[in-house]
Curated annotation (Swiss-Prot):
GO terms under cellular component: cytosol
Protein name as it appears in the record: Tyrosine--tRNA ligase
GO molecular function annotations of the record: ATP binding; RNA binding; tyrosine-tRNA ligase activity
Chain ranges for the short sequence motif 'HIGH' region as given in the UniProt record: 36-45
EC top class named in words: ligase
Subcellular location: Cytoplasm
Binding site for ATP: K225
InterPro entries: aa-tRNA-synth_Ic, Rossmann-like_a/b/a_fold, S4_RNA-bd, S4_RNA-bd_sf, SYY-like_C, Tyr-tRNA-ligase, Tyr-tRNA-ligase_bac-type, Tyr-tRNA-ligase_bac_1
Locus of motif 'KMSKS' region: 222-226
Catalytic reactions of this protein: tRNA(Tyr) + L-tyrosine + ATP = L-tyrosyl-tRNA(Tyr) + AMP + diphosphate + H(+)
Function according to Swiss-Prot or TrEMBL: Catalyzes the attachment of tyrosine to tRNA(Tyr) in a two-step reaction: tyrosine is first activated by ATP to form Tyr-AMP and then transferred to the acceptor end of tRNA(Tyr).
EC number: 6.1.1.1
Transferase in keyword set: no
Length: 412
């Protein structure tokens, strides 16, 4: 474990670890949990997936836990308000999807589901066998619990009890599977240490915990959220193109952190990128983005993302798929207009009307310079009108001003 901990420290992605963990020399197994709060994992989960894969390269046996049982309750960690409880059929569906996703990204890694050992457990048995080992004062002292109790929202007994469930997970895996290490994001430290204490109180042996920093920007906000929603790993929810564009648009200052947490590049490669970043941050950002997209969606996914990006350039719109148009709209680059009222209008009026140009004078100047495009064609003159033949997939049109400014018209 000493080599692994040093690797994490050198990389700058070690938040905390249990006393004595760095002295463990015998082979050890470790697990990391994923609660099925949605039907797909998101980019924040990719840190955990990379973490499990990184552990395997150091001879640590990784195990992924899908929390069907804990997902029925909801983890209050990092949440300022109560989670909306999911129905059992929704949790089951999400769990199946997450298991498939984890199997894809972690081939050969054992995946367990905590519903296996919680199913059939009665409330009386749980309170007698588990609850008896927890002290209210200690639980109230946990940061997550304190913050929620002091908030206007408060915390329900349901979420307050989550820490017992996660602790029982750890104890079960320790006793039945010999898993002595639990890993997670920094917001999981309180839950992890509670599990370690529970294992000790049960007299089962010595367990350990290790956490990594959460993926946040310079303002402390989680990376992986956009105005239109979460960045998912499922390509049907977040396309490779959208993922590619998301990372390309991140501030340059976020690149070193992204490279460390979301890639499996070696520390030596990371340090080399740090040096190059000082002179050419854009090239490093592009390389890191390509590395992440390839890891998640494969070479084909990267090629598609690059193809769509290129096809957005003037003259190449014919290769854009319907999903690509939808992605642009979901990224806030779209506007809906009434089909009947829009068709037949002059383009110069439409460009000004949707706010793409500030005035007709600006629009005329850009048209004369061949700088305004409708799909793959520059607007011929200021008298050109919107024709039915210009509509793609019966509802989309791509407006462009040069190479960077783009807007999708969605006809309804």
């Amino acid at each position: 474990m000493r080599d692994f901990i040093k690797h994490l420290k050198d990389r700058g992605i070690l938040e905390d670890f249990s006393h004595g963990l760095d002295s463990v020399e015998s082979p050890i197994s470790a697990y990391l949990g994923f609660d099925p709060t949605a039907a797909s994992l998101h980019i924040g989960h990719w840190i955990g997936i990379c973490f499990l894969r990184r552990m395997a390269s150091f001879g640590i046996t990784p195990v992924a836990l899908v929390g069907s049982a804990t997902g029925m309750i909801g983890d209050p960690s990092g949440k300022s308000i109560e989670r909306t409880l999911l129905e059992s059929n929704e949790v089951a569906h999400n769990s199946k999807k997450l298991s498939e996703c984890l199997s894809h990204y972690l081939p050969g890694v054992q995946i367990v589901n905590n519903m296996e050992w919680f199913q059939g457990t009665t409330v009386i048995d749980f309170l007698r066998d588990v609850g008896k080992h927890f002290r209210l004062g200690t639980m109230l002292g946990k940061d997550t619990i304190k913050q929620r109790i002091q908030s206007e929202e408060g915390i329900s007994y349901t979420e307050f009890s989550y820490i017992l469930l996660q602790s029982y997970d750890f104890a079960h895996l320790f006793e039945k599977h010999g898993i002595a290490l639990q890993c997670g994001g920094s917001d999981q430290w309180g839950n992890i240490t509670s599990g370690i204490d529970y294992i000790r109180r049960k007299g089962l042996g010595q367990a350990y915990g290790l956490t990594y920093p959460l993926l946040t920007n310079s303002q402390g906000k989680k990376i992986g959220k956009t105005e239109s929603g979460t960045i998912w790993l499922d390509p049907t929810l977040t396309s490779p193109y959208e993922l590619y564009q998301y990372f390309l648009r991140l501030p340059d200052a976020e690149v070193p952190k992204i490279a460390r947490t979301l890639t499996l590049l070696s520390n030596e490669e990371i340090f080399d990128l740090d040096k190059k970043f000082l002179s050419d941050p854009i090239a490093v950002k592009k390389f890191v983005t390509e590395t992440i997209v390839t890891s998640i969606h494969g070479e084909d996914g990267l090629k598609k993302a690059q193809m769509v990006t290129q096809s957005m350039h003037p003259g190449k719109v014919s290769s854009i798929s319907e999903k690509d148009f939808q992605d642009l709209i979901s990224m806030g680059q779209g506007i809906s207009l009434d089909r009947v009222q829009t068709l037949g209008k002059r383009w110069i009026d439409l460009f000004v009307g949707v706010g793409f140009c500030n005035s007709k004078g600006e629009a005329r100047r850009l048209i004369e310079q061949k700088g305004l495009y409708v799909n793959s064609e520059p607007i011929a003159d200021e008298h050109s009108v919107f024709e039915e033949r210009q509509v793609c997939y019966d509802q989309y049109v791509l407006l462009a001003q040069g190479k960077k400014k783009k807007l999708v018209l969605h006809l309804i």
